[in-house]
Amino acid sequence: MPLEHRIDHRLRLVLTRAVGTLTDDEVFAYQHDVWSRPEVAGYDELIDMSAVEHVAVPSPDRIVRLASVSAGMDVGMPPTRLAIIAPRDFEFGLGRMYGAHREMDSRNTKRVGVFRSRAEAQAWLGLDGEPPLEV
């Protein structure tokens, strides 16, 4: 399973880890499957891209589409945050591109931050007092 996740209700956080080869179809499926659940409304999100070995390169249009679909799922939701851990340049760039397009969408309520380390991501989410969070 390229995208593994768990829901931490105590922290109000969805933790996700991408593993191996990642395709945009898997990312779209994850977005729909996880974020259409009412119990995660208003939760922050932490996505760890550290274990990704290959990204099946999506077209820029697919990144824009994913950002639009994601923002569309935010309608009526309180403001939340998404921290992406991306130690390598390629995944870091994709995360920044996704975040920029998502934040330009007027329906968006989720701030996106892209970080090189877990410690930076957890601090940005206000979870720096927690042990390293894992899926």
At which residue positions do the language-model features occur?
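Amphipathic, Lys/Arg-enriched alpha-helical "gate/interface" segment within cytosolic domains
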Residues: 1-135
